[in-house]
Amino acid sequence: NNIEALYRCIEKIIRCAKKLGKLVVATGDVHNINREDRLYREIIVNQNVPGKGRHVLARYLSGSKKACKNLDNINKVINICEEQEVKTDNVLNKVLKYIYVLNRIKKIPITASNISSIYSVSKNSQDEEIFRGKDGDAEKLKAISTVLRKLNVANVVKEKDGIYELNGNYIESEMPVPGHIPNQFFRTTKEMKEEFEFLNDQELIKEIVVTNPNKIIDMLEEIEVVEYPDKPYSPIIPNSQETTINMVFEKAHSMYGDPLPRNIEERIAQEFYGDNILDLVKEKLKIDHPRLSDERLDEEFPSLLHEIIISGYDAVVDIMADKLKRESEMALDDKKVREDAKAALGGIIGGGFDVIYLIAQKLVKHSNDDGYLVGSRGSVGSSFVASMMGITECNGLPAHYYCPKCHYSEFNNEKGEPYSIEYASGFDLPNKNCPECKTLMIHEGNDMPFATFLGFNADKVPDIDLNFSGDNQASAHEYTKVLFGTDNVYRAGTIGTVADKTAFGYVQGFFEERLYDQLKIEAESYGLTVTGKDELKKKGVIKSFVRIPEVERIAVGCTGVKRTTGQHPGGIVVVPGYKDVWDFTPFQYPADDPTSAWRTTHFDYHAIDADLLKLDILGHDDPTVLRMLQDLSGLDVTKIDLGDLDTMKIFTGPEILGVDRYKLRGTVDKDGRKYCPTGTLGVPEFGTNFLLGMLEETKPTTFAELIKISGLSHGTDVWLGNARDLCTPNSEGKIEVPFKNVIGCRDDIMVNLIAWGMKPVKAFKIMEFVRKGKASKEPAAWAEHVKTMKEAGIPEWYIESCRKIKYMFPKAHATAYVTSAFRIAWFKVHHPIWYYCAYLSIRRDQFDIESMIKGADAIRAKIDEIDEKGSAASNKEIDTRETLCICLEMCERGFYFKNIDVEKSDGKKFVITDDEKGLIIPFRALDGLGDNVALAIVKARKEGPFISQEDLSTRGKVNTSAMEKLKALGCLDNMSESNQLSLF
């Protein structure tokens, strides 16, 4: 209703600013590219903003703490802004912003009456009342005070102790108007000019829309907001290269002796400096000893290679520089040659990644010193150097033996053939005594090329991901502050976006809200009261009137929109000491709390991952379970035999556990009978229904096959419709390819192709192409690879299997998972009560105490009851079923559960009974009790025994509902109700 007054205000501001020599620029506050996108923004804001849809500016102007907790900082920014901006719409907000600058108004929601009242009292005011004059705060304060007085007279605001607040009574009768989201789409120049047609001055319009914005652009300095260097800026650790070299050779010599076997010496050299290092040293050897025969040169090569490697980085650079000088036809500057030589080197040290390895080593050692194992993720396990530094337990060498006493090692059998031809994993090698000292040798190696981690010439940036115990993760995070300093480490920021299903709910909710508002207005016009929206939805009165296809169409526009910011669960970004965090990103505090222990990068970490090192210090249950098993047993879990035959048997059936598979629950056989085909329930990576099916079909008997199964289960289009069809009987009962030969992990492709005679570089390129699923995306390139494979004699079934693959799991990751799983499975077979205690304490959250304490039959009945519900079963019931399947197995093995004991139960963990045949259920297992109350009970019990139910409730902070559940279970039968004693 006041649009004309609004136009006059804008015109006054513009002309006043021009007289004062101010640069007036028309800007668009753009949130959308297209005009139609406004609906999407309105839907998103409607869901995410407290107050149902109030724009963030409206929340800021009203002093809402939800808008921003740094209002003073925003006000400072407003005050130092030199240019006067003319918004293309919603100019009222600009005026209100000016009023709020001096913090004189505590609360001004944007409503219809506010707009009308403010402009009705300000349209005839003097220019200085709207425009912030050049004479500073005195004039602005005078102008604002005048406006506030008029608002007060108009009953829009009220004054108390010098603070102006919105008059609540004035607002109660107001109905917020729809359309609270401004039109913030990206306007064309023509559309921008049309917005200012009310000025009736084409020259002025052109000036503020075209000329002045260009002047602003010309004033701006061109900057690179986010740098994109060749590799991340890493911290500096003094003597890192020397430390890395010494650490690796010290460990290698302790295992394989000194001098090292040639293949190990070469592997270390290639990982340190890239594949070219071998040819470089051979060339130097020939030049230095031109008269030696090829046979003699070959004999001398290992010792010279070792001498050069331990001499350090500079020695290798010198050799490369000499090579470049020899190959150049012109004289080269020494400084330039050394720079080129450094650039030509790859690998861990040659590429400058030794610091990253050392950091990972320090983090792992810190956790190990605290008593926790650390699992490796990704392909870092294929790095033999990482293995020697203790970063990973995986050994990437081919299958082999080594003697722990005299350090003899053996990679070939009596025929001179590599063990890796028959054994894909060294853990499957039969036991063998050392031929030198008769000591039982250790079998090792899982045949993983280093190229899968750092590329063929070790030219990729290493990404070392580690799985720490959830109990020790926070300690590992804090340790980075010790390593680098508090001001140099930040939690990696993330941006959460709207998922497709969430967007669908947003859209439906938006239209339901709109329908409810219309219904409410209509009802109130007749003096009727409308009940709450949720109640009307239940009755079917309120539901989206928009057709599902239209809802889906609109939801697409909302999908992927920024919803919130957060932090990576384990990502720590390291800013080196020679750089400043501001060179890369602002930072923020979680929940805007400056006292938070950690600060978070404001930019999503993906935006700066090329600039800064990100440490992935992730939490995982396996190290926690293994630590608890180690504490319970007193055994060193790293000494467990990964070739234990009894443990291997649980992957083909539960009989080794002493139970009948048809008394267990897991899945259903072809005749509809419930059973469990394996003994792997509760074994990480091997206990899900999908894995139970895979295990039943593949019947693995070796560690290598377990690794292959892990790779197959984590890949995409690798098992179903691919390997499964090759290794399981067809309609004629025939198997096309033995299971051990199918492709399971990405490393298998490179190893297999090399074994078939293909050059390593070609094999690597095909592996990279296949594992990324490019065969269907790049048919021309795939045709060339097919030609290469056919020329090498690769079977058709293998080529076709490669074609189908969309994603492949790294073998090192699978090996690390299977290693942890096998150790846990070993306890399940040989020390079951410790296993069940650790598993249920750490990995399960949902329990059914009533059936657990009654034994196997009651547990089986409860599982069947949940199964009968089918898809109607809740997530909680499904989780409970998983727990009960393990509990059933435990009871069938002759063990039992003891009810919650007020005097003996732990807060969170199961406790082994004195006869070591049962487990006492912890307090947290009681539905609705919660960890905090469970721990409070234990803490209060340590201070003194509970003398009554009243005492338990009071000191243990147990609510009435939980007390009733404890009574129903019979946990309180031996306790009086009150603290008072009865004399009668």
Can you name each region flagged by the protein language model?
Residues D29, P213:
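Conserved, mostly hydrophobic/aromatic
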Residues K206:
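Active-site microenvironment for binding and transforming phosphate-containing groups
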Residues E4-L23:
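Histidine/acidic residue-rich metal-binding segments in metalloenzymes
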Residues T27, I43-N46, S64-C81, T88, ...:
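Noncatalytic, beta-rich nucleic-acid-contacting surfaces in large DNA/RNA-processing enzymes
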Residues I44-V56:
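Acidic, Ser/Thr-rich peripheral helices and adjacent loops at domain boundaries
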Residues Y119, K123-Q126, R132-K158, S961-A962, ...:
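Charge-enriched amphipathic alpha-helical scaffolds
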Residues E82-F131:
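Short amphipathic alpha-helical interface segments
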Residues N34-V45:
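Histidine/acidic-residue-rich catalytic or RNA/ligand-binding cores of hydrolases
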